[in-house]
Structures are given as C-alpha cells and as structure tokens.
Amino acid sequence: MSALSASLAAAAAAARASETSRESNNVAVTKARPPQHTLVKPAPAKPPRPVARRPKQPVKITVDTSVANTPAPQGSSATSAAAAAARHFKKQKDEQSSPKLSPHHRPPASHRNSGESAKTPSSDSRPASTTSTIPVTPVSATTPSSTVAAAASAAAKRSSTFNKSVPTPVVSDIMKKEQEENRAAAAAAAAQEKATQIIRDLPSPSNSVRSKRLSQSSLVPVLSDEDIYNHRRYARSSQSFATIPTDEDSPGEMGDFEDNNQVHRERARGIQSAAKHANRLSQTSMDSTHTSQQLQPVVSPHTGLPQEGSVLAAALKAGSNASSTMERISLTNEAKEREKAEKRQRKDAKAKAKLLAQANAVYQQSTNESHHAHHHQYHQGNIFKRVIGKSGKPIDPFQGFSPNFSERPGEHFHNHQREMQGAPDGIRRSMDTSRQSIDAPRQSLDAARQSIDTPRELTTNDTSPIPIQPLKSHDAGAVSDLPTSLDEPGLSGHPHLQQSFSNNNALQTVKSSTDDSMSIASLDSVDDSGPGRPPLLAPIPIRNASIIPVSSESESEDIRRGHRRHLSSSQSQRNSLQFPMSPTFSASPAKQLITPEQLLPKRRRGIARTPSVSSSAPRSSSPVISIPLERSSTLQSTLQGSPMNSPVAKSPVFFEGNNGSTNGGLGSSMSNSPPDSELALTPSESTAHSYFAREYREPKSSSTRGVEGASRLAKKLPHRHLAAGGKSIVKSIWNKATPDAPPPPPVSTGGMKTSLRKQPKKKFNEDKPWKHHNDADTLTDADRKRYDGVWATNRGAHVPYYMEPEEYDILIDEEEFYDEGFLSDSDFTDSDSDDDSVSSAEYIMSGENIGNDDVVVSDQNDAVHGYIVSRLWRRSRLPDERLSDIWELVDRCNDGTLDREGFLVGMWLVDQCLYGRKLPNKVDPRVWGSVGRLNVNIKIRQKEPKRNSAKRKARRKVRRDRKELVRERERNEKERRKDEKKEKKDEKKDKKDDRRRDKKRVGEA
C-alpha cells in the first residue's frame, strides 16, 4: 500500500504541475520541493506574431507495477519508489532532449525567419542528484489534468475495494494520435479550401505589370493535382498569371514575359513548387498540436474586413492594383482600335471620292454641251465636285450653289437634296428633276433669242432696235433715238427683250479658244438719270467663244481652285463647254449684235450701290443700254456721247474728276462706283491674275464716301512693297483701316544703343519704301510679268468698235496673218483703203516722251480700251488728277487706247504713286526699254585714257620681249634634244644593218 500511495502522490503532483505550466504558455515548469530540483523558467520573448513551437513527444503516464510488487526496502519505501520513478523519467527525457528530425519534420520557414526557436528546458539545467525528490510526471498538453486525477482516484477506489494491486488506467497512444490526426486534417482542409478560393478569385494582372509580393504568412495553400490542373486551365483561358510563392523562403515574382507559352510554363512551375512547399508544411503540422492556435484569422471579427497581413488582404490589394492596370490597358487598346477604325474609314472615304471623281469625269464627257454650259451659267462654281456625307452617301452636287434665276437661293433643289441624301435609289430621278428645272429657263431664253434674231435679219438698220452703223456719228438725234429703258418704244414691242433686260444673269467673261487673251463682255450699268447718258458698248467679236464662269467673292477659295483645276483638266472638256447663247459672228460687223443680257452686269445680292455725288436725281432701277464707241483722237467725245463740237483735250474726261458738274457723263456716274463689284477682270483659268482686283477690294458695307476722300486716306496709310510672284502688293485700304478707325501710330522703342558697333543692313522696310532706291527707275522682271498678265487679260476688248466695217475686215485679215506667222510690216498696211480709214497697224510718230527717230507700231489687237484702263486704275483709289497725269505720260496712240508698253508703264507709275514717290516730268527711256518685247540690255563701257600710258606700253613691250626670248630658247632646246635623239636612232639603225650584212657574208662563205 505504501508503494501505491507514493505513485498516486506522484500523479497528483504531476497534474498540478501540468495545470501550472498551461497557464504560462504551455511551458513545463517543475515545482521541485527541494531547491536543487526546480526547473528554470525561460524569459518570455515578445514575438512579432504567434510562433509555433515544436511540440514534445507525448509521454505515457504509466505506473511501474514492478515497484509495487517488489518488496520494499527497509527504511522509507515511498522514497525508493519515487527514486525509481525519477530515474525512469530522466532516462526518457534524455532520449527526447536530442531528437533526430527527418527531412519531412523540418520546421516551417516562418519559424526560421522570425529568428525564434522552441526553447525547451534542457537536462543540463537540472541537477544530477535526484535523490530525495519526487519527480514530476510530464503530461501531454492535450490531455486534461482532470482525466488523470479521475483515473487515479478510480484506481485507488478499486484497489481499496478489492485490497489488491491494480494497474493505473493509462491514456492510450492510439487515442492521442487519432485526436491529433483529426484536428490536423480539419485545419489542413480549412486552409486548403481558403487558399484555393483566394487563388481562384485572384484577378489576372497584365504581362507588362509586376505584381506585388504577397505578405509572408503561415497560411500556405495546399494544392492537390486537381487544383493544379484547374488553375493551369484558368491561366490558359485568361492568358495571364497569378503571383504565387515559388520558393519555400520567399514568394516568387513573375516579371514581364513576351511569350504566352513562357508565361504558362512559369506559372505551372510556380504552382508545383508552391504545392510541394505546402505539402511539406502540412506534413509537419500533422504532428503539431499548435497549428490551430497559430492560424491567423482571415476576416477580423470586429470589423468584418480582411485582417492585415493575411493572405486574403494581400490578394485583394494585388487584385485591385492589377484591375486598375487592366482598366488602363483596356482603355488604351480601345483608343488604338478606335484610331485604326477612323483611319480605315478615311481611307474608304478617299477611295469612294476617287471613284466618284472618275464617275463624274465620265458623266462630264457624256453630257451635252448645252447642259454643261447652263450648269456653269446658273451655278457659278465647280458643280462637278461632289463630296461624301457623314452617312457615306454622295451629297447633291448642286448643294451650296444657289441658282441665279430663283428668288430664294437653293429653292429649286431642296427636294433634290433630300432625295440625294435620303434614298440612293432616287438619285437618277432627282437629277432628271434638276435637269428639267434647268432646261426650262434655257428653252425660254433660246425662244427669246430666236424671236429677237428673226426681226433683226428682216429689218433694216433704221428699224433695228440696237443698230450699230448709224451710231458712227455722235449727233444728238442718233443718241436720242436709242432705247434707254424698258418703257421706251424701242423695247415695248419685244417682251422677250424686256425679260432679258430684267434677267441679271449675264455672260461675264468670254475666252477665245484660238488666243490666250481674255476680254470684258459685261460692263457696269451706270446712272441714266443725268442728261448725258453713257454710250452703248457693242459686243466683242471673238471667234470660237466659250464660256468661263466667274466665281463670286462669296465663294470660298477652295471652290475657285477646284473650278480652275476642273477647267484646265483636259482640252476636250474645255471645248465641250461651248456656250450655246454666244453670238455667231459673220464677216460683216454690222450684223454682229449681242443680246442685252450679255451686256448688262450681274448685281450681287446684299451689296448696295454707292450713289453718285454729282447726280441729284434718284437712281433708276431699269438698266441702261450703251452705244458702241467711236474711234477719235481723244476719249472725251467717245465716252461722253456728246457732239463733236467740244474742244479736243489731251487728257480723257474720266480722269478730270469733275464730280460737281451737271453733265458729268461717264466720269460723274462712275466716280463713286464700287471698283470690282461688276467687272470680272480675273478669269478662273488664265494664269494672268488681276492686279488690283485682289489688292483693292471694295468695302464690305455701302457708304457715301467719294473717291477723293479714299485717295486722301490712301496717301496717309502705309503701303507694301511689290512682292514677286503676284502676292499682296498694297495693304487693303478698305479692309485694314477706315477713317473711323485710323491705324495706330508706330510705337518707338526708345532707349540708348546697347552697342556702338555698326548694325548690319536690314531688309527692305515696306512701311518706308522711300529708303529703297535699287531698281526704282526701271521695271523688274517680276513686275513686268505681273503687269503682262493684266494686259493679256484685257487687251483688245471693245477696241474693234472704234473702226468701220472695212477697217474691221482689215483687222481680221491681219489677225490671220499673225496666226500664220507673216509678221512683215508690209502686210499691215492697206494701199487700197481710203485716206480717211486708218489701219490697225498704223505707223504713228511718238509723242514728247520718245525721241523723234523712234517709230511705234500701234496694233489694235494689243491695245487696251480707255474705259477698262480707267476701271483698273481707279481701284488704286488715287485722285483722278493724278491718274490723268499718268495717262498723259503713257498715252502714245492718242486714240483713247493704250498699247502694251503704255499700259505696263502706266500700271508701274500707279504703283509708284502708291509707294509715295512723285511722278516724273517724263518717262525715262530706260523704263520704256525695260517693258519692250525684246528686252536685251547690252552695256558698253568706254575706257577712259589713263596716265603714263607710254611708260606702261614700254614696260609691257619689254616684258613681251623677255617672254619671247625665253620661249625661243625653250624651242631651240627642244629641237636640239630632238636632233640628238634622231642621230642616236640613226646610229643604232646603221649598226644593225652592218651586223646583218656581216652575217649574210659569213653564211654565203
């Protein structure tokens, strides 16, 4: 009984020790009653996170029955039993103090990284002497102390009941292993499920973005073969990878990969290594009893959010970064795709436009000439230019071009545009409708022409409504018989003529297909309220005339350029645009009449005409017919239409500027007219551009300012220098500055010079043209070419109607001679003509500006009408007195016209006046030479006699003699060397002949 009681006492002491050790983090601390057997308690460390210590092997709680069966020694039987139990426990502890771990039982990486290890009390801390001590029996951490106490008490009862030795019940090793296996399996299954769910929920980051490392944690995913297969399949479908641990020490990091196959291989390799690592850790945790305590909670129980440092928080953080990167990449890809789609659409649009252009070209060739001509007449612009709308359908070619014969712009083509844009099937029907709307007024105009031409052929010159032959004389009766308005009897019997008068669509520009010269066919309808009505201007007899539409200012420059390209595309298209209403001219000019609609200018809507200053009566709305101009010595009688009893003045009347006179005539009515509102002096196709048409534009709004006020303003404003290539010549007076808003004065920089060095010469200052004197007295090549373009555009217009029919026939014959190349002066004169008739190529002695020995040939084909000259020059806004002075300087024909040289020099003088220079008293001959057709300047420089010429000649002779002696010596030396060489050669030849003879003799012997 004593042995049994000692064992029970030892078991109770062990139970108390286990309870005490569990309260201090499961560290076994022995409570030895003697001081030498007390276990040293290690100092508690402060780990950064829960650390899993390596558990001890469970100790079997057994009671040595052999001690009880053996007879107790004398003395203290309890002491001997306790000593035996202590020795047995020490032996087992020594075996456990140095365990041999297998590779599978390697501690996890978190234990090594944290730098902490499981500190167990070693046997060295315990004294060797165990006598007189009661050993503390170790109990498993998982075995409750109450179970051991209950087992001990039950054994004591049974032993006391049966009065015999009964072995103490022991907790079986199989039971403990089963409990540990179940607990470890549950923890591993939960960890595997959570890790698999996290990896599947991870977003797929882009290949170009590095994923952030997942934070180190003890929660490592345990992946099976099925999970690895599913994850690999997910990686293939998404073509991306997830960041997973690739090494047991640190998580792996996938970088940038260009090949998707390489990405798949790396991901599969990382998943396999992670699975191996997780399996090793799980195998170790199977034997651990602290696994469930050291697992971090994934979700915080307080906030419901992912716990910091957990795998889920790191995964969510990496997923958010990856998702934002994916959004940016997707937006960039969408922008690139959108840009590619836009480029593709533009390319398709260009291809469609090219196909439409080809179709339009075929359509142009297939359409008849009248259809094309009326298209150009009623739609001033490139009507064949089609554009592609937003829907990819062709827009109506007439869109943007309002027909002139309608009151509302575009009224006839609204339905046509709807059909073109709405339904492609109605294109042919809409084009037929528009063609009918165009052909209807054309047929009415043709009928009007026929009705007008029929009575003209049947009636004589006395009954003709617009006679030409009786208008040769300028008596009052001839002028009074002319119909000047629609209410007069001359036009009352012709309704078609009245309709033509009311129609403002006139043929503006006519171009001859046999000559590059352009002419003016429409002139301003001037005020007819005054007593002195302007004369009628007869048509221009140009053979093979073809229409060229003149673009208005409202059209854009792109339309003008496109129209110019269209007209210059091919000669066949140019010839196909013959105007059906152009007059057919016979040999006799008396029958060459023109319809009034071709003479009357076209008024532009929205621009008010400036009223005349001298005319007090209101302007009449009815147009005025002009009469043909007669050839005379001056331009005064021909332009005013007054009787011939007026004194002959040298300067034309339209340059006098008498705005206050009652009988102002053409000068008073035209003094304040807009410069280029009606006259279209610039053709769309010709390379010769109008000089003043672009530079001196008319004001945007109507005003009552006179030309003199504008001229005074022009004197004060700065001007621009002539630029090469036909660019801007003078600053626009009406657009740049007005009297209401004068230009600001130049701002002076002031201050002292920063350097005393001489500054380099600057370029030409266009605000101070008087400081530039180079080439100021002659025309430059650029100026001459520019003025030649204006002259070629307007030469020969209205000039033949100065002559009588016989003179006109002579002019036609001479023009044929020009075409055939007969340019002899004898062909220009006509000996059979009367003395009164003047040939178109008349020898005229020059005026005071040219020497008496010079002869100028006046060719009417090259002359420019004085009326056109006045319209051109008045666009410069110079005073009429100044323009009259320029006319007197350049007028060499004295017949109301200017020849080529006079016109070019006059334009140059107008430009010089705009620069601020004064007019010369007479034109320098060098200026006339610079505008000649054969402008070849040969400069002959005469050498002046120099001093000491005799000495220089003597020295020159000595030098020549010395050189001659040296040359002689060189020649002699060369001859001597040559002779020596010849002698040596002869000697060698003689020796060779001698040897040959000797050999021959020896052979014969």
Swiss-Prot record:
Residues 1-170, 183-219, 239-258, 272-350, 402-587, 602-624, 657-682, 735-776, 942-1005 are annotated as: Disordered. Keywords: Lipid metabolism. Residues 845-934 form the EH domain. Residues 948-960 have a biased composition (Basic residues). GO terms for cellular component: cytoplasm; plasma membrane. It comes from the Eukaryota. The keyword Transferase does not apply. Residues 408-419, 763-776, 961-1005 have a biased composition (Basic and acidic residues). CDD domains: EH (cd00052). SMART domains: EH. Residues 1-18, 76-86, 127-161, 568-578, 608-624 have a biased composition (Low complexity). Residues 246-258 have a biased composition (Acidic residues). GO terms for biological process: endocytosis; endosomal transport; lipid metabolic process. Residues 63-75, 111-126, 204-219, 280-297, 320-333, 451-466, 497-522 have a biased composition (Polar residues). Pfam families: EH (PF12763). The keyword Protein transport does not apply. InterPro entries: EF-hand-dom_pair, EH_dom. Positive regulator of phosphatidylinositol 4,5-bisphosphate turnover and negatively regulates signaling through the cell integrity pathway. Involved in rDNA silencing. Belongs to the IRS4 family. This is Increased rDNA silencing protein 4. It comes from Yarrowia lipolytica (strain CLIB 122 / E 150). The gene is IRS4.
